[in-house]
């Protein structure tokens, strides 16, 4: 008797997402900040633990109920609030600079005009701002009310992508963003991309950690050429 095996010949990313959803459950969050608030939150969160960045963002918002006040703040005043985050000193310089540049370019402190641009043009616009790389720009576009199709690529996604063969092992955030975006199914929307980011980040924080990953517990172990290496 001949057995018929049902092989999943889909590209790797859709298979990964299905496995992660089955193990970790849905990771969608309907709460979205306005784009300027998301920019501030993402700049604070760069290279900083989420719980620290959340706490500092809340305190910064309390100190500056309107972000217009932050445009006029001195780096020293900003640093007194954001000191717990990593790279606090350059961020204290860059935050007011970025907001002032938005005002200079648009006439007011808002990023609503990005809604009319495609993803690539919006990314390029944001990356002209001080302190904004591809990760922060993608977070503004994807996590905010702009709800654009941009994948936020952090160190966890770079590590998973390198181990799974989706990316070169030495890829940086820019390369990772460009290459992963090309591999995403066209049918996936902004919510699909934000969920993929959260799923992969959670896997990277709990199982596929930087050192001594728990490969035997990983739902992607049979898809990973570096499993057990």
What do the PLM-derived regions correspond to, one by one?
Residues 2-229:
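Catalytic cores of DNA base-excision repair glycosylases
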């Amino acid at each position: 008797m001949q057995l018929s095996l049902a092989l999943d010949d889909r590209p790797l990313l859709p298979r990964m997402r299905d496995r992660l959803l089955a193990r970790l459950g849905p990771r969608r969050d309907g709460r979205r900040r306005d784009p300027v608030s998301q920019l501030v939150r993402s700049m604070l969160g760069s290279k900083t633990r989420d719980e620290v960045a959340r706490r500092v963002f809340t305190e910064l918002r309390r100190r500056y109920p309107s972000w217009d006040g932050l445009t006029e703040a001195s780096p020293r005043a900003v640093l007194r609030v954001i000191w717990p985050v990593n790279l606090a000193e350059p961020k204290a310089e860059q935050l007011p600079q970025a907001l002032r540049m938005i005002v200079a370019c648009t006439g007011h402190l808002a990023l609503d005009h990005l809604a009319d641009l495609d993803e690539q043009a919006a990314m390029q616009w944001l990356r002209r701002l001080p302190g904004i790389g591809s990760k922060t720009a993608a977070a503004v576009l994807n996590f905010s009310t702009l709800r654009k199709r941009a994948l936020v690529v952090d160190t966890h996604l770079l590590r998973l992508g390198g181990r799974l063969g989706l990316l070169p092992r030495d890829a940086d955030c820019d390369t990772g963003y460009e290459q992963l975006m090309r591999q995403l199914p066209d049918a996936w929307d902004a919510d699909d991309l934000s969920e993929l980011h959260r799923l992969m980040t959670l896997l990277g924080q709990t199982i596929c950690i930087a050192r001594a990953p728990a490969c035997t517990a990983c739902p992607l172990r049979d898809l990973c050429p570096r499993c057990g290496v």
